[in-house]
């Protein structure tokens, strides 16, 4: 009897990813905002270390933006330029308007790559990380952005 339930559980776990309808992204981009944690449960906040000093801060556990909203990626001498779709533009606008003085934490593949203090509202849907990223990461982000554009065009 236990063996049957165990096998049924394994079968269910094996089928869940197929039922989800998509594969996980090859690269993750998460943009979080610093929070005080007041009035929030421990499930709503996470601790993270931010460069350069390695200070520990609290961020909202659910990201404000992710690779799902990404539609353009370019790298030049000024850094990595990220362009977000309409939803991402609205979210970035709201986050930067409502959280002046807090840190915005940009995480790529689990690594904090940029953590500026929000001092201006970003209303054009473009975020620049002011340093170069490894070409392999840039290429993966560009692939995700292109896939998002194709998906939007089919809708």
Regions found by a protein language model. Give the residues of each.
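Structural signature of multi-pass, alpha-helical inner-membrane proteins
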Residues: 2, 19-155
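Sec-dependent signal peptide recognition
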Residues: 2-8
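Hydrophobic h-region of N-terminal signal peptides that target proteins for export
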Residues: 10-18
């Amino acid at each position: 009897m236990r063996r049957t339930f165990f096998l049924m559980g394994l079968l269910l776990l094996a089928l869940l990813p197929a039922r989800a309808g998509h594969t996980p992204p090859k690269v993750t981009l998460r943009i979080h905002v610093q929070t005080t944690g007041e009035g929030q449960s421990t499930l709503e906040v996470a601790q993270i270390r931010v460069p350069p000093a390695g200070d520990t801060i609290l961020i909202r556990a659910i990201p404000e933006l992710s690779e799902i909203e990404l539609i353009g990626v370019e790298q030049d001498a000024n850094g990595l330029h990220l362009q977000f779709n309409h939803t991402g533009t609205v979210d970035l606008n709201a986050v930067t308007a409502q959280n002046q003085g807090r840190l915005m934490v940009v995480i790529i593949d689990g690594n904090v790559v940029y953590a500026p203090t929000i001092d201006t509202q970003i209303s054009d849907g473009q975020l620049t990380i002011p340093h170069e990223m490894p070409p392999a990461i840039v290429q993966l982000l560009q692939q995700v952005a292109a896939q998002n554009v194709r998906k939007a065009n089919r809708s």
